[in-house]
Amino acid sequence: IIPIITMAFHFSPNGDIKRNEVNNLVKAVMNGAGLAGHHGGMCDAFRQSIDWQFLIGGQWVSHPNGITDYKVNIKNTNDPITDGIQDFDYHSEQYYMHVDPLNEVLATSKFKGNEVWKLEQEPGHPGSDTYITEWIKDVEMPVIWKRKIGKGKIFYISLGHFAKELNHPEMQTMYHRGLLWASR
């Protein structure tokens, strides 16, 4: 099962998933289905569903600086998903997430602490409050993880804001391998 849309609000105006829908998805994974996805299509989906978040192992919180340059650090070079991949530079949104400590983390990124955090405003509100995120300096954030739930497997990669990023060699290789891993 692959969530193929970018954000949950494409399903409904509020980005909701019905309880019976998420319950059926959980049952499918528990019984051996694989679930894989990337970026906001998986971890910024269904913000109101705690069961969805618990299943996939994380929830997007912010991407200070918007599109920015950062390094993806491979944490486990012995895994089939990351085999032969070295640390690499990346240009996109760097996700700050709430993540399950039970995830098997395969790659991370580190925040510099100089990112600009722009607060969301009410529609029509002029200006924007901004802050420098010095408190997240050196925070190591998972970028790729996998997990097993029941008989099923879940794979997630936070990269891929723009479709062209799917052509990035390292991202493409690990995403492809992760999809295959989750499907077996």
Give residue ranges: language-model regions.
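Structural recognition of the beta-strand scaffold that forms the well-ordered cores
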Residues: 1-5, 29, 34-38, 105-107, ...
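Glycine-rich loops and low-complexity Gly/Arg-rich segments
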Residues: 5, 9, 28-30, 60-64, ...
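A glycine-rich, often tryptophan-bearing local segment used as a flexible ligand/cofactor-contacting loop or short
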Residues: 7-84
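Histidine (H) residue identity feature
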Residues: 10, 38-39, 63, 91, ...
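Short flexible/disordered coil segments
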Residues: 41-50, 97-103, 126-132, 175, ...
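Extracellular ligand-binding/catalytic regions of CAZymes and related secreted enzymes
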Residues: 56, 115, 123-143, 148-184
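Catalytic beta-strand/loop cores that center a nucleophilic Ser/Cys/Thr
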Residues: 64-150
